[in-house]
């Protein structure tokens, strides 16, 4: 039976969220391909309500000729609703953080991700086709029992990572830099699995061995008050209070200012299904030093230095290398430009269009 409608279902349609933005981009692509397409969400940010409909309205269209494409990244009752419905089903998998990386600090989040991984397995028998945004994620799909899979990166407008920096933040960062010192940057949620404690250890070692004026800027909101407090105490114990900034949630212009002022992007995360800030760093031609774990080496490839472990002295040496070697910085900048071609929106749109048309035709 031919498919004339592909509707996406997502647990939460959030603003300034890579998966939420991808979902809207995919809806627009599906409509351009001639499919009827809407988004149904369990929850939505106030400024995203108009982009879709509550999942309670999912039954307003007939199942015949319709595909439900579920955006899977967390445990949610929405997944159970999709699984029980009679439409053909596709899944777009963005990975789910293993519970053992978060549950000691956030038991409730540990329960959510365990639920999500159980749903990943439960959806496999009823899913015809699954898309992963990295090869790492596709291997997890295969292990969970999905038979027909493909790797396609997130639909992202790379131009959206550019723009004018916030003048207030830019001025503050420039004043600090005028006093000397390297600026290290990490962008991402403050969460145990993101490895901010390892970043702080690396900064301490880098200051001791190479640059006593170096600073670390951690940009992103916290999802664990307990972990955030522990990090702040750790910073105090190491006497780094003046050298570590927890910037919290920032707007787009403020984020641009942090990227523009940074000398190195450092990622020591314990788990990443893709890691969009790596692409942001490439757009800004910011050298990357990263722990080679999960999807990180696949996303970075030759556009950064990837390390086999997070031993502070090794990380510090890598940072010193990219800061002090102009030729290496130019090589990495050129590699970033080349790597970004893989993620160019027109190219990824073509991949999604071809893959979904083929899956619907089966």
Model-derived features with residue positions:
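Short hydrophobic beta-strand element within catalytic cores of glycosyltransferases
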Residues: 278, 287-290
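A conserved mid-protein helix/loop that constitutes part of the nucleotide-sugar donor-binding site
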Residues: 21, 182, 191-205, 226-229, ...
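Aromatic "clamp/platform" in nucleotide-sugar-dependent glycosyltransferases that forms part
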Residues: 270
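Short alpha-helical donor nucleotide-sugar binding micro-motif in glycosyltransferases
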Residues: 250, 257-262
């Amino acid at each position: 039976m031919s498919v004339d409608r592909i509707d996406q279902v997502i647990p939460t349609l959030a603003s300034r969220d890579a998966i939420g933005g991808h979902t809207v981009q995919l809806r627009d692509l599906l409509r351009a391909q001639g499919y009827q397409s809407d988004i149904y969400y369990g929850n939505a940010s106030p400024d995203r309500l108009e982009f879709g409909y509550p999942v309670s309205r999912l039954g307003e269209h007939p199942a015949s000729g319709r595909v439900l494409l579920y955006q899977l990244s967390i445990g949610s009752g929405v997944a159970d609703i999709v699984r029980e419905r009679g439409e053909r089903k596709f899944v777009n998998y963005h990975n789910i953080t293993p519970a053992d990386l978060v549950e000691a600090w956030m038991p409730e989040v540990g329960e959510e991700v365990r639920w999500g991984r159980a749903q990943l397995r439960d959806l496999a028998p009823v899913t015809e086709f699954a898309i992963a945004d990295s090869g790492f994620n596709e291997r997890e799909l295969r292990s969970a029992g999905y038979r027909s899979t493909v790797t396609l990166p997130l639909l992202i407008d790379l131009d959206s990572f550019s723009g004018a920096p916030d003048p207030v933040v830019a001025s503050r960062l420039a004043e600090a830099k005028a006093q000397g010192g390297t600026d290290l940057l990490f962008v991402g949620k403050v969460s145990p699995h993101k490895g901010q404690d390892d970043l702080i250890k690396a900064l301490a070692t880098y200051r001791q061995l190479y640059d006593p004026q170096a600073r670390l800027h951690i940009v992103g909101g916290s999802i664990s008050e307990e972990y955030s407090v522990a990090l702040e105490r750790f910073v105090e114990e190491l006497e780094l209070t003046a050298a570590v900034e927890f910037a919290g949630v920032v707007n787009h212009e403020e984020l641009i200012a942090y990227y523009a002022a940074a000398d190195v992007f450092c990622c020591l995360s314990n788990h990443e299904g893709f890691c969009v800030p790596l692409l942001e760093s490439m757009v800004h031609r910011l050298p990357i030093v990263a722990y080679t774990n999960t999807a990180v080496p696949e996303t970075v490839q030759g556009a950064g230095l990837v390390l086999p472990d997070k031993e502070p002295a090794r990380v510090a040496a890598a940072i010193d290398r990219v800061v002090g070697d102009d030729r290496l910085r130019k090589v990495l900048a050129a590699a970033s430009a080349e790597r970004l071609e893989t993620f160019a929106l027109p190219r990824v749109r073509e991949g999604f269009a071809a893959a979904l048309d083929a899956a619907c035709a089966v």
